[in-house]
Swiss-Prot record:
This is Neopentalenolactone D synthase. It comes from Streptomyces avermitilis (strain ATCC 31267 / DSM 46492 / JCM 5070 / NBRC 14893 / NCIMB 12804 / NRRL 8165 / MA-4680). It catalyses: 1-deoxy-11-oxopentalenate + NADPH + O2 + H(+) = neopentalenolactone D + NADP(+) + H2O. Its cofactor is FAD. Catalyzes the flavin-dependent Baeyer-Villiger oxidation of 1-deoxy-11-oxopentalenic acid to neopentalenolactone D in the biosynthesis of neopentalenolactone antibiotic.
C-alpha cells in the first residue's frame, strides 16, 4: 500500500531545497560580456549589400516552425515570394545550433520529423541523430524553394505596419528594408542560450562554452563523439537535463576526468533505439505519417486509441496511466481520478528510481541520481548509456543538493564548499523560456502595429490573441508560439497544425480577393476569456513541481496567466482549429481591401 502523503512530503522536501527567491533571475542572458556564448561556431560571417524589395510573405525564423509554414504556404497559396529571415547561417533552428555529441530527438523520428511522406524520405533510425534531422530541414528548404529568397545571418530589428500601403516594413541589422504583405514569427524557444548566474563566471580563465554552441575545435570529434582533444583535460559540465543526458556519456569516454554538477536529476528511461526496418518501410501506405502522428498525439494526450502505432516510452507512460484509472472514469469523482493519476505517476517514478539502483554501483551516487518529483515536472529523458557513465572511475557526480554551483574561481568550480579544478567548463543550462521571458524580449526586435501600438505594450500583462495566432491591431501578422495555443511533447506536430491553419486563412484571403486580414476585437476578447477560464487547471500541479523550465523555476504564479497554453489540452485545441476551418466562414476575422 502506497502512503501517498509520505510521497508528497518527500517531493515537497526535495522541491523546497531547490526553490530560490530570485526564480528565473538565477540565470543570465548570453548578452553583453557573455554575448560570445551565443556566437555562431558553424558558419563564417558573410558580407552582403542591404536588400530593399517587396515580398509576399516574410517568415522570421527558419527552424522547423518556419520551414513548415513556408511549405504549407507553398502548397496552399499562390505566393511568388516567401522569405525566411534567420540569424543562423542555415535553416534548421535548434537543429542548426545544437550539434553536441550524442544529439538525437527524444520523440520517435517517424512522428517528429515533418513532411517525410511529402519528401519521400525516411529516417535511418527510430530516434534520428541531430545531423540527420538538420539535413532533413535542409531538404525541406530545397524541396519547397525556401532558400531562394532567404536572408540568413540576418537579425530583424523592427517590424512596423504601414497602413497606407498595407505592408509590413521589415528592418534588419544588415540595413535591409523589406516591404512584406504578410509576416509570420516562428521564433521558437530553443535559440537564446542562458547561463546560470554563478558569481565569478566572468573571471573564469579556463575554456568554456554552452552546449548549443559546441566547440569541436577545442574538444575534437563531432556529433557522433570521439572528443579526442579532451584526453588530458579535466572537464566540468553544469546541468543534468535532456541535453546533458545525451552528451555526458561522450564526454566521459574522452575526458581525463569529468565532473558533473547536478542541481536536479532527470528521469532516465530506456530509449531502445533501432534501425528503420526495410520491411516495415516497404509496407507503408499513403497517409501513414499523418495517421501515426495523430495516433501518438492522441495517446500521449490521454485519448484512448485502438492501437499504439509508436510503442515507445511516451506511449508506455500513457498506457500505464490508463490501466490504473477507474474503469468508469466519466462517472468517477474528479478527486478519485486525480488520486489515481498521482498513484500511476508514483509507480512509474518508483520504476525509474529502481532502474538507477540496478545500474549505478555506488549507493551514494545512485541515491543522488534518483528523481523525486512528478514525472512531467521535467521533460522525461530516454537513454541507454547515461546511468552507466557513473560507474566509470573518471566520472564524479557533484550533487549540489539542489542549490547549484556556488561560484567559479579563475581555475575551478566551487560547490558544496569544495573546489574542483577544471580546464574546461560546459554549460548545459538550457534556453530562455517561453514561460518566464516575455515574447517581445525573446524576439529581440520591436513589433509596431496599426496606430503605432507596440506588441510589448499590448502584451504588458500577458498575451492577447485569437487562437494564439493572430492579434487585433496587428493585421496580416501571425505568431507561432505556445502562448494561448496547443502544447504537446511533439512540438513539430503542433507547429504543423498551426502552419496548416495559417495557410488555410491566407488561401481564403486570396480566394476572396482581399488584401488584409486581422483578428477582430471580439474574437480576441472571447479567446482570451477562454484561456483565462481554463488556465488554472494545472496550476496546483506545476506549483508542486521541482523548480524548472515548466514552472518558471518554482514560481508559476509569477508568470502571466495569459501566457498559458490552451488549458483544454492539445487535442481539444487542434479540434477547435479544425472545426473553425470546416465552418469556412472565417468567423472573428476581419477582411478588407488594401
Amino acid at each position: 500500500m502506497v502512503d501517498i502523503e509520505a510521497v508528497r512530503a518527500k517531493y515537497r522536501e526535495e522541491r523546497d531545497k531547490r526553490v530560490q527567491a530570485d526564480g528565473g533571475r538565477q540565470y543570465l542572458s548570453a548578452q553583453g560580456e557573455f554575448a560570445h556564448y551565443a556566437d555562431d561556431p558553424h558558419a563564417k560571417p558573410i558580407e552582403r549589400a542591404p536588400v530593399s524589395d517587396e515580398v509576399d510573405v516574410t517568415i522570421i525564423g527558419a527552424g522547423i516552425g518556419g520551414l513548415l509554414l513556408g511549405a504549407r504556404l507553398r502548397e496552399a497559396c499562390a505566393f511568388d515570394t516567401i522569405r525566411l529571415v534567420d540569424k543562423a547561417g542555415d535553416v534548421g533552428g535548434t537543429w542548426y545550433w545544437n550539434r553536441f555529441p550524442g544529439l538525437r530527438c527524444d520523440v520517435e523520428s517517424y512522428v517528429y520529423m515533418p513532411l517525410l511522406e511529402e519528401l519521400g524520405r525516411l529516417p535511418s533510425e527510430k530516434y534520428a541523430t541531430g545531423a540527420e534531422i538538420f539535413e532533413h530541414c535542409q531538404a525541406i528548404a530545397r524541396t519547397y524553394d525556401l532558400y531562394d529568397e532567404a536572408l540568413l545571418q540576418t537579425s530583424v530589428t523592427e517590424l512596423s505596419w504601414d497602413e497606407d500601403s498595407s505592408r509590413w516594413l521589415v528592418r534588419t541589422d544588415r540595413g535591409d528594408l523589406v516591404r512584406s504583405r504578410f509576416v509570420a514569427m516562428a521564433i521558437g524557444s530553443l535559440h537564446r542560450p542562458k547561463l546560470p548566474s554563478i558569481p565569478g563566471t566572468e573571471a573564469f580563465q579556463g575554456h568554456s562554452f554552452h552546449t548549443s554552441r559546441w566547440d569541436f575545435a577545442y574538444t575534437g570529434g563531432d556529433i557522433s563523439g570521439g572528443l579526442e582533444k579532451l584526453g588530458d583535460k579535466r572537464v566540468g559540465i553544469v546541468g543534468t537535463g535532456a541535453t546533458a543526458v545525451q552528451c555526458i556519456p561522450h564526454l566521459a569516454e574522452s575526458a581525463a576526468h569529468l565532473y558533473v554538477f547536478q542541481r536536479t536529476p532527470s528521469t532516465v528511461s530506456v530509449r531502445n533505439n533501432r534501425p528503420t526496418d526495410p520491411g516495415w518501410a516497404a509496407g507503408l501506405e499513403p497517409g501513414w505519417q499523418q495517421r501515426r502522428m495523430d495516433n501518438f498525439h492522441a495517446l500521449t494526450s490521454g485519448v484512448d486509441q485502438d492501437v499504439d502505432l509508436v510503442q515507445d516510452g511516451w506511449t508506455e507512460i500513457t498506457s500505464k496511466l490508463a490501466a490504473i484509472l477507474p474503469k468508469s472514469a466519466a462517472d468517477a469523482d474528479p478527486k478519485d481520478i486525480g488520486t489515481a493519476v498521482e498513484l500511476a505517476d508514483f509507480h512509474k517514478m518508483e520504476e525509474l528510481r529502481k532502474r538507477v539502483d540496478a545500474i549505478v554501483h555506488d549507493k551514494d551516487t545512485a541515491d543522488a541520481l534518483k528523481p523525486y518529483y512528478r514525472l512531467f515536472c521535467k521533460r522525461p529523458c530516454f537513454h541507454d548509456g547515461y546511468l552507466d557513465t557513473y560507474n566509470r572511475p573518471n566520472v564524479t557526480l557533484v550533487d549540489t543538493q539542489g542549490r547549484g554551483v556556488e561560484r567559479l574561481t579563475p581555475t575551478s568550480v566551487v560547490a558544496g564548499g569544495r573546489e574542483y579544478p577544471v580546464d574546461c567548463l560546459i554549460f548545459a543550462s538550457g534556453y530562455e523560456s517561453e514561460f518566464g521571458v516575455p515574447y517581445t524580449n525573446r524576439t529581440g526586435f520591436s513589433i509596431v502595429g496599426r496606430d503605432g501600438i507596440r506588441l510589448s505594450e499590448k502584451w504588458a500583462e500577458g498575451a492577447r490573441t485569437f487562437h494564439g495566432l493572430q492579434v487585433n491591431g496587428f493585421p496580416n501578422c501571425f505568431i507561432l508560439s505556445k502562448a494561448q495555443s496547443g502544447l504537446h511533447v511533439n512540438v513539430p506536430y503542433m507547429l504543423n497544425e498551426q502552419s496548416k491553419h495559417v495557410a488555410y486563412i491566407l488561401k481564403a484571403v486570396q480566394q476572396r480577393g482581399r488584401q488584409v486580414v486581422e483578428a477582430s476585437a471580439t474574437g480576441e476578447k472571447e479567446w482570451v476569456e477562454t484561456i483565462l477560464r481554463l488556465a488554472n487547471r494545472n496550476l496546483d500541479f506545476t506549483e508542486s513541481c521541482t523548480p524548472g523550465l515548466f514552472n518558471n523555476e518554482g514560481n508559476p504564479r509569477n508568470v502571466a496567466i495569459l501566457n498559458s497554453s490552451y488549458g483544454g489540452g492539445s487535442v481539444g485545441f487542434v479540434n477547435i482549429l479544425k472545426r473553425w476551418r470546416e465552418a469556412d466562414d472565417l468567423a472573428d476575422l476581419e477582411l478588407r481591401e488594401g
